[in-house]
Amino acid sequence: MAGQQGIYCAPDNIVPNRDRVDVGCAPDGAMQLWVMEYEVTGIGKGCAMCKAINPQQAEMLLKSNGIYNGSSYLYKVTRIEQVIVPPCNGLMAEQVVTYKDVVS
């Protein structure tokens, strides 16, 4: 079995892959959650979450439905990770932008 891939959100006492089988990105066409980090040429950076069958479709959906969908060539996706949904409740994501990172 391959090593853990994707973002696994769970408490420390939950073992990754305990409740799932390693069957690839989307068995039988099931949709998965994907988180993407990207750059928008000349504008900045961003992140997005998408529900899609595979990472290629997630990227396509970002470019066709994102804020800059009229200029999809501006998007440069730098990272795509599958979100592994935990069997229990928990924090899924958090992002902090510090004041020194914000350009006035």
From Swiss-Prot:
KW Disulfide bond (keyword) present: yes
Gene Ontology annotations for the cellular component aspect, listed alphabetically: virion component
Localization: Virion
Signal peptide: none
Disulfide bonds, paired cysteine numbers: C25-C88
Subunit structure, as described in the record: Homodimer; disulfide-linked. Interacts with the major capsid protein.
The protein's name in its UniProt record: Portal vertex auxiliary protein
